UniProtKB/Swiss-Prot annotation:
Official protein name in the record: Histone deacetylase complex subunit SAP30L
Superkingdom, taxonomy of origin: Eukaryota
Keywords, ordered alphabetically: Acetylation, Disulfide bond, DNA-binding, Isopeptide bond, Lipid-binding, Metal-binding, Nucleus, Phosphoprotein, Repressor, Transcription, Transcription regulation, Ubl conjugation, Zinc, Zinc-finger
Organism of provenance: Homo sapiens
Gene coding for it: SAP30L
Residue ranges, annotated region (Disordered): 1-23, 85-105
Length: 183
């Protein structure tokens, strides 16, 4: 699911004959941007309640034209909405937020792809407080929330972490081996 519903989810009322054959055929985008109706041809993406909610949360100047009988939007607005939804707004620090660490174009790090043991190691290293018995999704969410809020260069930190794991120089690995050194 990408947040854009199918034509069955978003169709309201009886469809017109040409629109039923091909979504958006001969129709223009149903959105109004900055008070002006979009004239681009409508694609097969529709303006669902979920998309409308994300637009209102981001305070975008997009609205649906109430005079149209369809909910199809153009590819430009579809890509625009997806890109805005995928961008993560980072909190700026007291220094004005103009440092490279506070760039809003930094992609989201998907920590759910890490193994559970790695997430537990991260939690143990930073002494994060969690309830016992967290599943992987809850653990990844907790670690992700902490990871977003620590003031570090994320790329450098991950590179160093991977280097330490690959070179077997992790203190946690040495402790688990009962005191013998790893080569």
């Amino acid at each position: 699911m990408n947040g854009f519903s199918t034509e069955e989810d978003s169709r309201e009322g009886p469809p017109a004959a040409p629109a039923a054959a091909a979504p958006g055929y001969g129709q223009s985008c149903c959105l109004i941007e900055d008070g002006e109706r979009c004239v681009r041809p409508a694609g097969n993406a529709s303006f669902s309640k979920r998309v409308q909610k994300s637009i209102s949360q981001k305070k975008l100047k997009l609205d649906i034209d109430k005079s149209v009988r369809h909910l199809y939007i153009c590819d430009f607005h579809k890509n625009f909405i997806q890109s805005v939804r995928n961008k993560r707004k980072r909190k700026t620090s007291d220094d004005g937020g103009d440092s490279p660490e506070h760039d809003t174009d930094i992609p989201e790090v998907d920590l759910f792809q890490l193994q559970v043991n790695t997430l537990r190691r991260y939690k143990r290293h930073y002494k994060l407080q969690t309830r016992p018995g967290f599943n992987k999704a809850q653990l990844a969410e907790t670690v992700s929330r902490h990871f977003r809020n620590i003031p570090v260069n994320e790329k450098e930190t991950l590179a160093y972490f991977i280097y330490m794991v690959k070179s077997n120089k992790s203190r946690l690995d040495q402790k688990s081996e009962g005191g013998k050194q790893l080569e």
